[in-house]
């Protein structure tokens, strides 16, 4: 069972919040105190919440659920992509485009265009058009890949989103709320937990903390996928 320990979180700096003057009072239940003008997150609250979230990610994944990892901060971007790829799920790590979930029909058309351009790079189309046109299409392809590359194979809305930084990704959370999609999110002391179904109080800036969240989430998803494969094999054997 995918789980994290108190020691893991301490070593990663999960307990370091933001400066006290930037706090959000709604995070008061999860704050232990302050040190040198910086809030300290109560890891005794975070630990059970995090492990509960991991168990639910495993359950969703075991039912073939799709998880969308969201983290567009510079500190999270590459790690978000790596974690999603590692557990064969989906990601948005560059910029959240308004309507990515709530206007899925339009997004689907952009994904189709992205895939069409990818095909053109392989089937010789670019050799038959002018250099200028080829350059324009290459730039369009790069732009679409940056925005939609992580969801181009998602084939429909996700069953949950896992967010690094509730404050930074508030638009994604609001869209998920509007559609009834469960939200798992790292919520720092300057953020609101509103709209987050599975709150994980913790530092959302430190690279080591971000890596811990993503490694644990990816492990939970892989565990769920593994149990699903085992169940299918048993059913086939019977």
From Swiss-Prot:
Keywords: Ribonucleoprotein, Ribosomal protein. One of its GO terms (biological process) is translation. One of its GO terms (cellular component) is cytosolic small ribosomal subunit. This is Small ribosomal subunit protein uS2. GO terms for molecular function: structural constituent of ribosome. It comes from Actinobacillus pleuropneumoniae serotype 5b (strain L20). Belongs to the universal ribosomal protein uS2 family. The keyword RNA-binding does not apply. Gene3D superfamilies: Glucose-6-phosphate isomerase like protein, domain 1, Helix hairpin bin. NCBIfam families: rpsB_bact. Pfam families: Ribosomal_S2 (PF00318). The keyword Ribonucleoprotein applies. It comes from the Bacteria.
């Amino acid at each position: 069972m995918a789980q994290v320990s108190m020691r893991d979180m301490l070593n990663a700096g999960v307990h370091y919040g933001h400066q006290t003057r930037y706090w959000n009072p709604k995070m008061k239940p999860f704050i232990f105190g302050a040190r040198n003008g910086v809030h300290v997150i109560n890891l005794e609250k975070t630990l059970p919440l995090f492990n509960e979230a991991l168990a639910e990610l495993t359950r969703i994944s075991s039912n073939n659920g799709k998880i969308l990892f969201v983290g567009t901060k510079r500190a999270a971007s590459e790690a978000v992509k790596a974690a999603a790829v590692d557990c064969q799920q989906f990601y948005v790590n560059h910029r959240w485009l308004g309507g990515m979930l709530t206007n899925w029909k339009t997004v689907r058309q952009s994904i189709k265009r992205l895939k069409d351009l990818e095909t053109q790079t392989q089937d010789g189309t670019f050799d038959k058009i002018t250099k200028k046109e080829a350059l324009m299409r290459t730039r369009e392809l790069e732009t679409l890949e940056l925005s939609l590359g992580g969801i181009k194979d998602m084939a429909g809305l996700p069953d949950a989103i896992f967010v690094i930084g509730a404050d930074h990704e508030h638009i994604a959370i609001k869209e998920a709320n509007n559609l009834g999609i469960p939200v798992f999110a790292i919520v720092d002391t300057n953020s609101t937990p509103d709209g987050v179904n599975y709150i994980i109080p913790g530092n959302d800036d430190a690279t080591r903390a971000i890596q811990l969240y993503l490694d644990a989430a990816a492990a939970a998803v892989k565990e769920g996928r593994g149990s699903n494969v085992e169940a299918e094999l048993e059913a086939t054997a019977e």
